[in-house]
Amino acid sequence: MNATVHDLDGGDAGSVELPAIFETAFRPDLIGRAVSAAQANRKQAYGADEFAGLRTPAESFGSGRGLAHIPRSENVARRVPNAVSGRAAHPPKAEKDQTKSLNDKERQLAIRSAIAATADAETVAERGHAFDEDLDLPLVVSDEFEDLNKTQEALGVLEAVGADADIERAEEGRSVRAGRGKTRGRKYSQPKSVLVVTSEEPSRAARNLSGVDVATAREVNAEDLAPGAHPGRLTLWTESAIEEVADR
């Protein structure tokens, strides 16, 4: 199985033989577990203060007043979960273990399966990516792409090969996030677009484009290839990255 190699102008620069990893069976179940584990393992511990709701001089009036024996301060109930203004019954605990484990062989198979999904045009289209209908996947460009330093140069290559529509889709899809997250450093929600995989170091030229992520063939993971556990990300590979990913 071969893939067309494009030059920086979008022309045909030959072909490259795809390694066997691109023939891996499609396993969305394992990909989902790998992404879920990656997200869980980077969660920050979160919990309520151990003494939250207890720092009050509230006392129980005891018997004889026709009132519940709830500790009160100025006639306001405290400490009791089912009372107004009472403490939380079962608040989140900071010591809770939120990590998830995954067998090494399962994780490796998930990555290989996600890599193979980048070569399936139907899977990539179902994920919502926009690209020219006549574009052959996987999208491979010559190693000259790794020498680019300017964002406009990288965008020009994407336009030449027919993948620039996905950058526009991601840029137009950027919106203010709903909920409290926008006050916690996550103001905008940004759709994912092209993943750029190189051989030596992540591409500096492409990393500032809307929705674009960059990675090396050795370090690309399941979450890069399947954000949100949805496999089939539109991926641009350099020729050397294709050869290097064979060892994954």
Swiss-Prot record:
Membrane-crossing residue ranges in chain numbering: none
Gene Ontology MF term list: rRNA binding; structural constituent of ribosome
Xref: SUPFAM superfamilies: Ribosomal protein L4
Region (Disordered): 72-103, 173-210
A GO BP annotation: translation
Gene Ontology CC terms: ribonucleoprotein complex; ribosome
Basic and acidic residues composition-biased segments: 92-103
Record's keyword terms, sorted: Ribonucleoprotein, Ribosomal protein, RNA-binding, rRNA-binding
Start-end of Basic residues biased regions: 177-189
Gene3D superfamilies linked: 3.40.1370.10
Function according to Swiss-Prot or TrEMBL: One of the primary rRNA binding proteins, this protein initially binds near the 5'-end of the 23S rRNA. It is important during the early stages of 50S assembly. It makes multiple contacts with different domains of the 23S rRNA in the assembled 50S subunit and ribosome.
Subunit structure: Part of the 50S ribosomal subunit.
Similarity-based family: Belongs to the universal ribosomal protein uL4 family.
Listed NCBIfam families: rpl4p_arch
Name of the molecule in the record: Large ribosomal subunit protein uL4
